[in-house]
Amino acid sequence: MNFTHWWQLLFYGFCLITLIQLFYYCFFFFRLAFYKPNTKTASQTQPVSVIICSRDEAANLAKNLPGSLVQQYRTTHEVIVVNDNSFDDSKYLLEEYQKTFKQLHVVELKQEARFIPGKKFPLSMGIKAAKYEVVLLTDADCVPASEYWIDKMQETYDEDTEIVLGYGAYHKKSGVLNKLIRWETFHTAMQYFSYALAGKPYMGVGRNLSYKKTIFFRHKGFTAHNNIASGDDDLFIKTAATPSNTKINIDADTFTLSEPAKTFGQWAKQKTRHYSTAKYYKPLHKFLLGLYSLTQFLFYPLLVASILFYGWQYALIVFAVRFIMQAIVYYLCMKKLNEQDLYPWFLFFDIWMFFYYIIFSFTLIRKPKRVW
């Protein structure tokens, strides 16, 4: 074969990669970009159990727990903190809070659950202790973005809804690392919200997630993956979510906020733990997510090669088509998730994803550690 033909094939490969990317933007991400929640004629209220698992989180509880305790909610609710074998002052702090907030209940765990790493056992105990059908989950290092978090999240439920996916954001701070963390959080949320809207829900985040007790016990809780430290959120949603029983809520009042990692090493450790569950996803989800990641990873190397060896005019035309599509989708999605300050950086983030996949790809084959 003539040497020139190889670079034609390379350019055609670049075009194919771009077409696949455009498919994801049009078929999946457009759904979130142009999403408008159904307007309800009458507001519903139902009892809610907020559940927070904590281990040696006294400082975070002191800082964030009041945000869950002072919610403006028109009907009965409770806040359950599962204090899982803490050695710090969590017990005494919670006892003081209970004197003021009668809706606060504490589940004290004083013995480790053998063979069940992570927070799945304490979370199961919290759900078992919950008085009400609707449970709303968050973490000790999270605070609701508004006093209407409970109210707005439970409004999402209707007769068929059993799972509600919320957005767990990070506090906005200065520095490149903060922007990288928030970009990755946004980019992940854009995917799982869009997939849910397309009838293919595959994950949620434990920082802001709600479901009904009945669906939890119907699927026997976390028994299918009790041996894995992570997965109390995404692997359960993978098991229990269907196109008809899952909804999203992206009202800004329903967001939760967390402190981002302070160093790249801390963030890398978090991502290693989170991505360790990806290998357990359903085959369709693994294929769709893997194909998207692969085409995103290959896009810029093929762009550079096409510019150098085929023809920069043609390569830049293909790049421009994808860029315009990205500009539209990212603007609308970032606006919906209150991440507009990231928008001027989106081209930088898009290029960064090439290096991101290299750094974190080993987590897909690495055995997860058995930690809380």
Region locations from a protein language model:
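N-terminal membrane-anchoring/stem segments of glycan-assembly enzymes
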Residues: 1-44, 330
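Membrane-embedded multi-pass helical conduit in multi-pass membrane proteins
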Residues: 42, 293-368
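Short aromatic/hydrophobic "clamp" motif used to bind/position activated sugar donors
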Residues: 135
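Acidic donor-binding/catalytic loop of UDP-sugar-dependent glycosyltransferases
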Residues: 88-89, 140-155
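A conserved acidic beta->alpha catalytic loop
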Residues: 83-93, 111, 142-143
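Catalytic donor/gating beta->alpha subdomain of glycosyltransferases that bind UDP-sugars
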Residues: 157, 163-189, 214-217, 221-285
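Cell-envelope/extracellular polymer assembly enzymes that use nucleotide-activated donors
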Residues: 46-49, 78
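Short, acidic, metal-binding catalytic loop of nucleotide-sugar glycosyltransferases
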Residues: 66-76
